[in-house]
């Protein structure tokens, strides 16, 4: 089968032919119908320090996968050949993150992926493979950050910093929870989609949130220009949820953090149950992830687009589509 392989930091991705996977006990093979592209893939490619996560090398990248089960291993009872499934990026409990596809074992940038049954979530009717794939991280991560880590409730005021794929989902999720939402992105072109997603207003600088004093600020960027200013801009007693890995080190105004009783919380991924809830929201039409298809053979070039900040919403690819054919609907 065809797969996009990563051989080490600083080395280009390569399209290779690799053996088809075979499921052992408790595992299944999923024919991948859609796989999302993520900034975390860029972090892996750059060799960024990911804390306790150790990236296997070489490895097939891709941690946002969805498709159809084509074979099952011994002992698999709750799923069967033909089931439509998303492969959850389970990070709660956080110890499970080391088993993430595209990190600890081969991921979704391939025609088929080996997945443990404990990571599978059925895709409801009304949810496309593309939506199901990007939801495993892009939507579920935003859902956990806003709802669980941020404890956003009806009537809250929320700032969302970074209005890319995750940020747009964060805006919509906060709005669905009954919050008044303000968006922040240095690129004015990102403001229109955020306003359409439910933001009341958008700014270019995190410090502009100071006038609103949000109860919660969710930082999907994680850069020196966002995290420190978020701590200063949130209301006294408020919380800042840090999701982005834009910088290896953040400068935090300690006096503002301590004297104003601000909580700074790191947030990684989501639970399998949260992914189920996200799928139901998409099935009901309450959430509609913005997606754009890129041909599988052009995935390395698409990653370059992502690195340059040229993507609004979320990119995905169809590894099983004919490599000679361009984009099409899923």
What residue spans do the PLM features occupy?
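Mid-domain Rossmann-like dinucleotide-binding core that forms the NAD(H)/NADP(H) cofactor-binding site
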Residues: 84-85, 125-207
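Glycine-rich beta-strand-centered segment in the early N-terminal region that forms part
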Residues: 19-35, 49-91, 124-127
